[in-house]
Curated annotation (Swiss-Prot):
Positions of disulphide bridges: none
Organism: Sulfurisphaera tokodaii (strain DSM 16993 / JCM 10545 / NBRC 100140 / 7)
UniProt xrefs under NCBIfam families: thermo_KaiC_1
Every KaiC domain range: 4-249
Domain of life: Archaea
Family annotation (PANTHER family): UPF0273 PROTEIN TM_0370
Record keyword tRNA-binding present: no
The protein's name: UPF0273 protein STK_18300
Alphabetized Gene3D superfamilies for the sequence: P-loop containing nucleotide triphosphate hydrolases
Membership in a protein family: Belongs to the UPF0273 family.
Length: 283
């Protein structure tokens, strides 16, 4: 059975996912400070708007809506035009509706500790926009003071988002040097886990990404070098990073594996296009 996938169009990311994220999957993007988690999520939303005209929603739990828009623009991603067209929305779960700027937001969560309220506001936003992509930044904020509730909170949000046909990234914070994913039981509740890391070796920092799991999908089983450029994240999907006690090295993947990844991305795009053509004919 063919798995329908959502292309991220993040350079190198679809390749290491063998075609993209399976539709309706909830993917945990985990990592320490400065690893590029939020950038990855915003790039996922922006690419959906530009490449596929897919409406998206950003749930802001740690940034003021003004800061969110500014951070998009930092990479040349102007989402204000899509916001005006009703194709992009920010769910403000940061300001609690306080302040003149916050009062202009259409989707506001006044009590962030009330996951039921957040789910309701998010449900309304998804339905109104007919959204296809959602990013929550960061989901770990919701259970910092109640870690025992982490899994149930994630499951509640997952039911709403996947139930309405969306594919999502949940940004999850971990401490620098910590190798977990952020929140007990969360890794079992989500469909996919992607870990971003920033490692130091002999005074030099190395960025990398590794896919720990992805339901209904083959994945690359190695750690890939990654860069944050002026245009966003770029993953060196055809190379792997290896850091030991004695050296750090970047080596090319076997050619067979490179060809398999390229083919998977091409087939994913062809499958999506054929389905869209069939839907147009039915209309």
């Amino acid at each position: 059975m063919k798995v329908l996938r959502v292309r991220t169009y993040i350079p190198g990311f679809d390749e290491i996912l063998y075609g993209g994220i399976p539709e309706r999957n909830i993917v945990l993007i985990s990592g320490g400070p400065g690893t590029g988690k939020s950038i990855l999520g915003k790039q996922f939303l922006y690419n959906g708007l530009v490449k596929k005209d897919e409406p998206g929603i950003f749930v802001a739990l740690e940034e003021h809506p003004v800061s969110v828009i500014r951070s998009f623009k930092h990479f040349g991603w102007d989402i204000t035009k899509y916001e005006k067209e009703g194709k992009f929305a920010i769910v403000d779960a940061f300001t609690a509706g306080i302040g003149s700027t916050a009062q202009k937001e259409k989707y506001v969560v006044k009590d962030v500790d009330n996951v039921g309220e957040l789910s309701g506001v998010l449900r309304d936003a998804i339905r109104n926009l007919n959204a296809k992509r959602v990013v929550i930044d960061s989901v770990s904020t919701l259970y910092l003071s109640k870690p025992a509730m982490a899994r149930s909170i994630v499951m509640q949000l997952k039911r709403v988002i996947a139930g309405l046909g969306c594919t999502a990234m949940f940004i999850s914070q971990v401490s620098a040097g910590e190798r977990g994913f952020g929140g007990p039981g969360v890794e079992h509740a989500v469909d996919g886990i992607v870990r971003l890391d920033l490692d130091e070796y002999e005074g030099q920092l190395y960025r990398s990404v590794i896919v720990w799991k992805m339901r209904d999908s083959k994945i690359s089983m190695v750690r890939h070098p990654m860069d944050i450029t002026d245009e966003g994240i770029v993953i060196q999907w055809d190379k792997y990073l290896r850091i030991t006690n004695v050296k750090a090295e970047i080596q090319p993947l076997p050619q067979k594996e490179i060809e398999e990844m390229k083919k998977a991305v091409e087939e994913s795009e062809e499958e999506k296009e054929s389905i869209q053509e069939a839907e147009i004919e039915e209309e």
